Curated annotation (Swiss-Prot):
One Gene Ontology cellular component: cytoplasm
Keyword vocabulary terms for this entry: Activator, Conjugation, Cytoplasm, Plasmid, Transcription, Transcription regulation
Protein task: This protein is essential for positively regulating the expression of transfer genes that are involved in the conjugal transfer of DNA between bacterial cells.
Keyword hit for Signal: no
Claim: Transmembrane is one of the keywords in the record: no
Taxonomic path: Bacteria, Pseudomonadati, Pseudomonadota, Gammaproteobacteria, Enterobacterales
One of the Pfam families matching this protein, by short name: NikA-like
Taxonomic source organism: Escherichia coli
Protein name listed in UniProt: Protein TraJ
Subcellular localization, as worded in the UniProt entry: Cytoplasm
Length: 124
């Protein structure tokens, strides 16, 4: 709200009174918290038709970027081994199988994160 005041150079002076049930109040407050904004800002944005983007989405995206980087590095190591690069001569079959296991685990982690982002939106 402070940013809004600075951008417009004035304070908001009009207030809306909206009667709600206690469970509606709890749900609105929880939604505002998930979005990372105040209840007033949440209601103002929703009331003006803005789509609310949650903070959790950004955290999941950062986590996916990290996991994707890990997957790229693991894939690079596997590629070196498959091309018979001299730098990988010291690695045996057990090491490569462990690498493949890490790649599979990393893919599973990416799937888990994607489900955490997508499934809450699919539920009513």
């Amino acid at each position: 709200m402070e940013n809004d005041e600075k951008e417009h150079g004035r304070r908001r002076r009009q207030h809306l009174r909206v009667p709600v049930f206690p469970e509606e109040k709890d749900e609105i407050e929880a939604n505002a918290k998930r979005a990372g904004v105040s209840v007033a800002r949440y209601l103002r944005d929703v009331g003006q038709g803005y789509q609310i983007k949650g903070v959790m989405d950004y955290q999941h995206v950062r986590e996916l970027v990290r996991v994707n980087g890990d997957l790229g590095r693991l894939g690079g190591l596997l590629k070196l081994w498959l091309t018979d690069d001299v730098r990988t001569l010291q690695f045996g079959e057990a090491t490569i199988l462990a690498l493949l296991g890490r790649i599979e685990a990393t893919q599973d982690e990416m799937s888990r994160i994607m489900k955490a982002v997508v499934q809450p939106r699919a539920e009513p």
